[in-house]
Curated annotation (Swiss-Prot):
Gene giving rise to this polypeptide: FLRT3
Transmembrane segments: 529-549
Main localization of the protein described in the UniProt heading: membrane
Subcellular location: Cell membrane; Presynaptic cell membrane; Endoplasmic reticulum membrane; Cell junction, Focal adhesion
UniProt cross-references to Gene3D superfamilies, sorted A to Z: Immunoglobulins, Ribonuclease Inhibitor
Keyword field: Cell adhesion, Cell junction, Cell membrane, Cell projection, Developmental protein, Disulfide bond, Endoplasmic reticulum, Glycoprotein, Leucine-rich repeat, Membrane, Repeat, Secreted, Signal, Synapse, Transmembrane, Transmembrane helix
Region (Interaction with ADGRL3): 38-67
Biological function: Functions in cell-cell adhesion, cell migration and axon guidance, exerting an attractive or repulsive role depending on its interaction partners. Plays a role in the spatial organization of brain neurons. Plays a role in vascular development in the retina. Plays a role in cell-cell adhesion via its interaction with ADGRL3 and probably also other latrophilins that are expressed at the surface of adjacent cells. Interaction with the intracellular domain of ROBO1 mediates axon attraction towards cells expressing NTN1.
Domain Fibronectin type-III as annotated: residue spans: 409-504
Organism of provenance: Pongo abelii
Species lineage: Eukaryota, Metazoa, Chordata, Craniata, Vertebrata
The name this protein goes by in its record: Leucine-rich repeat transmembrane protein FLRT3
Cited Pfam families: LRR_8 (PF13855)
């Protein structure tokens, strides 16, 4: 049996504990008025906020702040006190620097679609437990990443830097990274040290860069022993890369390049590879046995290649017919010769390969006869193709011409200044080529900052017009023979030339066509006699028509008075003539006009007379007032114009 005193003590203790815990509970469940809170998820997105609201609950785990206008000044310092926050969504805001004051234990940070330019060690060291960092669609460049910025990011597994301004792979990335996305930047080269140590990397995406075979080191991917997916889509490769890591690589994407050759050892030891895509390239044949090591291949996609179904492709037919059902091969359709065009290689008979044909496409190694060749260093703008001490460099005039070598002209380039911001580039090829890489750079600019502009032109073209240049500025133009028709060109040495645009003023045309076009408005050409006579007749005819129209308009009233009926009259004209004439006659209205018929020749008396109206046959109604006591009585037509029925002499 509990005594009353002891019961009172227990009740008081419970009340005290409740009073202490209640404020904390209320504070934990508070929510900013502009947000919505739901069990640790704070929804403040799409609210046009310029700063992160205060009063976020302490038990928050995920902050949705995307699609606002939050800038760096709008991140409060007390945000770092939210120790339970693990995910922050700040994409599509107005950040121009990597944000600070973030919660220490955040693991997932979304900063896409801002304008972030710099990444510093100070900002990353305050969030050491970060595992996923997404920086797509920002303005990050290689020089804006501080050296050693990631040295304390020992838990970082995923780094997305797609669609930025990178010209090289960032140095010093943590070894823990498993997925690295660098697509749609301007990376021309990848050296072995840049990826050295990334032994945990499983997925590497390098789509849409400026990579060619010279820009890839010999064994740049070889040490990535855990790599399972490699994507090199939309680059400038002319041959499939070699020395790929064969231990775990399962997916390889090489589509949308300029690959016209596959080295025999390109896919050696890739026994785990099950998906290979080489669509949209320039492959016409494949070396025999190229797929022998692909033990686990199940998806082989080779669409949109100019396959030449000659004798060298007969082995492919035999290989396809021996594959198990689980292997899915797409895109092996003949494009040449014409007799098998559009047919699947797998369905061809042995006789159709025509192995005795002397015109079979073959792959031959060729080297260009260019003496004293200077090979460009990596990450630098390529030097001129030859050293010729006895020949002076061309002066910076409007027109220039250069060739690959006096002994053998591989490419001959001619550049002409067309306008103050346009140059015309033309070239001649000594060898048939499938594609060339044309690039231009304003002199005085560093290639590291993305000022090089490149484009791929087909071998059939012989000229190109470059626009949107700066007036009165020097430029360097280079061309690289990427490949030749059915041949592989190992030496991709550029041929360069310097030129300058015209000053910004009234441009004086330099071409004969432009001169003729400018002079043409001031010429007095001899017109044909028939044209002169026809023009004179037309002018006289127009003048006569104008005179007739003027005369008819002037005498229109006279003509109408001579007619008994005038259908074009208006009702108010009838009223005006009928109500003002004084005559001892009867007013007859016919159609829309009238006629005064005299009754006798007697003089008009001064007595009051009444004009009796004869209604016309067209149904026009006249509303008449029967009150005739006063001379001021009036009746109104339906048009509102007064009509006097009584008049006094």
């Amino acid at each position: 049996m509990i005594s009353p005193a002891w019961s009172i003590f227990l009740i008081g203790t419970k009340i005290g504990l409740f009073l202490q815990v209640a404020p904390l509970s209320v504070m934990a469940k508070s929510c900013p008025s502009v947000c919505r809170c739901d069990a640790g998820f704070i929804y403040c997105n799409d609210r046009f906020l310029t700063s992160i609201p205060t009063g976020i609950p302490e038990d928050a785990t995920t902050l949705y702040l995307q699609n606002n206008q939050i800038n760096n000044a709008g991140i409060p310092s007390d945000l770092k006190n939210l120790l339970k926050v693990e995910r922050i969504y700040l994409y599509h805001n107005s950040l121009d620097e990597f944000p600070t004051n973030l919660p220490k234990y955040v693991k997932e940070l979304h900063l896409q679609e801002n304008n972030i330019r710099t990444i510093t060690y100070d900002s990353l060291s305050k969030i050491p437990y970060l595992e996923e960092l997404r920086l797509d669609d920002n303005s990050v460049s290689a020089v804006s990443i501080e050296e050693g910025a990631f040295r304390d990011s020992n838990y970082l597994r995923l780094l997305f830097l797609s669609r930025n301004h990178l010209s090289t792979i960032p140095w010093g990335l943590p070894r823990t990274i498993e997925e690295l996305r660098l697509d749609d930047n301007r990376i021309p080269t990848i050296s072995s040290p840049s990826l050295q140590g990334l032994t945990s990397l499983k997925r590497l995406v390098l789509d849409g860069n400026l990579l060619n075979n010279h820009g890839l080191g010999d064994k740049v991917f070889f040490n990535l022993v855990n790599l399972t997916e490699l994507s090199l889509v939309r680059n400038s490769l002319t041959a499939a890369p070699v020395n790929l890591p064969g231990t775990n690589l399962r997916k390889l994407y090489l589509q949308d390049n300029h690959i016209n050759r596959v080295p025999p050892n390109a896919f050696s030891y890739l026994r785990q590879l099950y998906r290979l895509d080489m669509s949209n390239n320039n492959l016409s044949n494949l070396p025999q046995g190229i797929f022998d090591d692909l033990d686990n291949i199940t998806q082989l996609i080779l669409r949109n290649n100019p396959w030449y179904c000659g004798c060298k492709m007969k082995w492919v037919r035999d290989w396809l017919q021996s594959l198990p059902v689980k292997v899915n091969v797409r895109g092996l359709m003949c494009q040449a010769p014409e007799k098998v065009r559009g047919m699947a290689i797998k369905d061809l008979n042995a006789e159709l390969f025509d192995c005795k044909d002397s015109g079979i496409v073959s792959t031959i190694q060729i080297t260009t006869a260019i003496p004293n060749t200077v090979y460009p260093a990596q990450e630098q703008w390529p030097a001129p193709v030859t050293k010729q001490p006895d020949i002076k460099n061309p002066k910076l005039t409007k027109d220039h011409q250069t060739t690959g070598s006096p002994s053998r002209k591989t490419i001959t380039i001619t550049v002409k200044s067309v306008t103050s911001d346009t140059i015309h580039i033309s070239w001649k090829l000594a060898l048939p080529m499938t594609a060339l890489r044309l690039s231009w750079l304003k002199l005085g600019h560093s290639p590291a900052f993305g000022s090089i502009t490149e484009t791929i032109v087909t071998g059939e073209r012989s000229e190109y017009l470059v626009t949107a240049l700066e007036p009165d500025s020097p430029y360097k133009v280079c061309m690289v023979p990427m490949e030749t028709s059915n041949l592989y060109l190992f030496d991709e040495t550029p041929v360069c030339i310097e030129t300058e645009t015209a000053p910004l003023r009234m441009y004086n045309p330099t071409t004969t066509l432009n001169r003729e076009q400018e002079k043409e408005p001031y010429k007095n050409p001899n017109l044909p006699l028939a044209a002169i006579i026809g023009g004179a007749v037309a002018l006289v005819t127009i003048a006569l028509l104008a005179l007739v129209c003027w005369y008819v308009h002037r005498n229109g009233s006279l003509f109408s008075r001579n007619c008994a009926y005038s259908k074009g009259r208006r009702r108010k004209d009838d009223y005006a003539e009928a109500g003002t004439k004084k005559d001892n006659s009867i007013l007859e209205i016919r159609e829309t006009s009238f006629q005064m018929l005299p009754i006798s020749n007697e003089p008009i008396s001064k007595e009051e007379f009444v004009i009796h109206t004869i209604f016309p046959p067209n149904g026009m109604n006249l509303y008449k007032n029967n009150h005739s006591e006063s001379s001021s009585n009036r009746s109104y037509r339906d048009s509102g114009i007064p009509d006097s029925d009584h008049s006094h002499s």
